[in-house]
Design a protein with these regions (language model features):
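Redox-cofactor binding/interface segments in oxidoreductases and associated redox assembly factors
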Residues: 51, 68-72, 101
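A short hydrophobic/small-residue beta-strand
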Residues: 48, 98-99
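Short loop/helix-cap segments at secondary-structure boundaries that form the rim of catalytic
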Residues: 37-44, 61
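Rossmann-fold cofactor-recognition segment
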Residues: 42-55
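Oxidoreductase cofactor-interface core, primarily capturing Rossmann-like NAD(P)-dependent enzymes
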Residues: 1-37, 54-57, 64, 75-85, ...
Length: 199
């Protein structure tokens, strides 16, 4: 079975859409905080299990019978490393054989403050003894949506990149890559630096 954390989140929903085109629904486990939000998944035949990144025991129970896990990084900045440790420990206790993790583009060299928690998680995975792959996602195109109205109003898009360029990609694009890595064989030990095709 294949499990996805954050399955009802912005990225997780797209991953599930992709995954269900190649994997039978009854072989997919959606790990969610609020099962009420996953009712449509249950109706499709997806196995829905409740767990929170902060509850290692619940995660261990939710991961029973799971062979592969997509660990979608927590959105709680400053808490990610602790929460991800809970997931990795639970995966090990449950006998998960492979974890794909959504990290940060060039996390090992990135000057972004977010990189530290991703690097810590990558190290935990390396030390866990579980086979893993890293999906180092770049900037989400959707991150620009909040600044679209003022940009349209003033006729200029303002960003912090100076003269630099950003090759963003949509969540749907990153999700398609994640679904392939978690559904297919042969990705253990791989690091995928993912971004848009053009800056």
């Amino acid at each position: 079975m294949i499990a996805i954390t954050g399955a009802t989140g912005q990225l997780g929903q797209h991953v599930l859409e992709n995954l269900l085109t190649t994997v039978p629904a009854d072989q997919v486990v959606a790990i969610v905080r609020n099962p009420a939000k996953a009712e449509s998944l249950s109706q499709k035949g997806v196995v829905v299990r409740q767990a929170d990144y902060g509850d290692e025991a619940a995660l261990t129970a939710a991961l029973q019978g799971v062979d592969k896990l997509l660990l979608i990084s927590s959105s709680e900045v400053g808490q990610r490393a602790v929460q991800h440790r809970n997931v990795i420990n639970a995966a090990k206790a449950a006998g998960v054989k492979f974890i794909a993790y959504t990290s940060l583009l060039h996390a090992d060299t990135s000057p972004l403050g977010l990189a530290d928690e991703h690097i810590a998680t990558e190290k935990m995975l390396a030390d866990s003894g579980i086979a893993y792959a890293l999906l180092r996602n770049g900037w989400y195109t959707e991150n620009y949506l909040a600044s679209a109205p003022p940009s349209i109003e003033h006729g200029v898009f303002i960003g912090a990149a100076g003269n630099g360029k950003i090759a963003s990609a949509t969540r749907a694009d990153y999700a398609a890559a994640a679904a392939r890595v978690i559904a297919e064989e042969g990705h253990a030990g791989k690091v995928y630096e993912l971004a848009g095709d053009e800056a």
